[in-house]
UniProtKB/Swiss-Prot annotation:
Core subunit of the mitochondrial membrane respiratory chain NADH dehydrogenase (Complex I) which catalyzes electron transfer from NADH through the respiratory chain, using ubiquinone as an electron acceptor. Essential for the catalytic activity and assembly of complex I. This is NADH-ubiquinone oxidoreductase chain 2. It comes from Balantiopteryx plicata (Gray sac-winged bat). GO terms for biological process: mitochondrial electron transport, NADH to ubiquinone; mitochondrial respiratory chain complex I assembly. It is an enzyme of class 7 (translocase).
Length: 347
């Protein structure tokens, strides 16, 4: 892709997100979502093959449907309230429709079907943008709606997302699909405390973006997209492979890695608000995520080939990608759990 075109597209994607985050007028919010959606489609189709075309089409149809629902909710609200700006008094029907539209944009259950399919059909850099930056705008919309959102609807969506994010990843061998189901589960964890503690939700979103970015950069450095190719990486890039497995376990929420911090804080917040059953269910379903990450770590690091035939191994023919930023990202993504006591300020 031409560097100038790439710069224009990325600027539009960022501008759309910033418009959504800073606007107080519903029409501008809708325009920001549209700019964001239309600008990212060329990035999804960058490889220009049938699979990426199909992924971009699925993404467009899903996001366009969510945008229509969002506009419907905005119009219903303006019909009842007589204004287009954010207000604490919002029509209940409009609030429910708007919540469903934003959950569809985020890829939360039961509107999650597009996330694994789209992620699998696009390149790793495009997948990184879709699973990190593209989550910020819908989350800022939910953050704005937090005081008036339907709590029961949000809790049902969050527990469904955590469960489906765990179940869906159990039989996957494609790393991009595993990351997609992990994204669905993490989004479910974050939305569960959105009403109770929105600031903590933003912290968890930051940690999720940090860990997902690090994992994708490791996969890009190793040029691997399947569990088999990751298992064959030991003789090619042993440090990258080890770091990838540590990041996978951190995403699964295994203590003492960073990924345990958001789960710990969210369960503590839920129990503080007398949601004991929900906290228990989410802790149990989190084991599904941890299981497939542990299985991935086992198959790639603790099982070796029965023979020493070098022809089975993956040889490094091309120069490796630059990894100068990776050490700092890996340290932040795996070793910041001791900072948890300083987060008491969020309560």
């Amino acid at each position: 892709m031409n560097p100038y075109i790439f710069f224009i597209i990325m600027s539009t994607v960022m501008l759309g997100t910033l418009i959504v985050m800073t606007s107080t007028h519903w029409l501008l919010v809708w325009m920001g979502f549209e700019m964001n959606m239309l600008a990212i489609i060329p990035l999804l189709m960058k490889q220009y093959n049938p699979r990426s075309m199909e992924a971009a089409t699925k993404y467009f149809l899903t996001q366009a449907t969510a945008s229509m629902l969002l506009m419907l909710a905005i119009m219903i609200n303006s019909l009842y309230s007589g204004q287009w700006t954010f207000t604490k008094l919002m029509n209940p029907t409009a609030s429910v429709i708007m919540t469903l539209a934003l959950t569809m944009k985020l890829g939360l259950a039961p509107f999650h079907f597009w996330v694994p399919e789209v992620t699998q059909g696009i390149s790793l850099p495009s997948g990184l943008i879709m699973l990190t930056w593209q989550k910020i705008a819908p989350f800022s919309g939910l953050y704005t709606l937090a005081p008036i959102i339907n709590l029961d609807l949000l809790l049902v969506v969050s527990i469904l997302s955590v469960a489906i994010g765990g179940w869906g990843g159990l039989n996957q061998t494609q790393l991009r699909k595993i990351m997609a189901y992990s994204s669905i589960a993490h989004m479910g964890w974050m939305t569960s405390i959105l009403v109770f503690n929105p600031t903590m939700t933003l912290l968890n979103l930051f940690l999720y973006v940090l860990m997902t970015t690090t994992t994708f950069m490791l996969l890009m450095a190793a040029s691997t997209t399947t569990t088999l190719s990751l298992a064959l990486m030991w003789n090619k890039m042993p440090l990258i492979t080890t770091s990838t497995l540590a990041m996978m376990l951190s995403l699964g929420g295994l203590p003492p890695l960073t990924g345990f911090m958001p789960k710990w804080m969210i369960i503590q917040e839920l129990t503080k608000n007398n949601n004991i059953i929900l906290a228990t269910l989410m802790a149990i379903t989190a084991l599904l995520n941890l299981f497939f990450y542990m299985r991935l770590a086992y198959t790639t690091s603790l099982t070796m080939f029965p023979t020493t035939n070098n022809m089975k191994m993956k040889w490094q023919l091309n120069t490796t990608n630059q990894t100068k930023y990776l050490p700092l990202l890996i340290i932040m993504s795996t070793m910041t759990l001791p900072l948890t006591p300083t987060m008491v300020l969020l309560n």
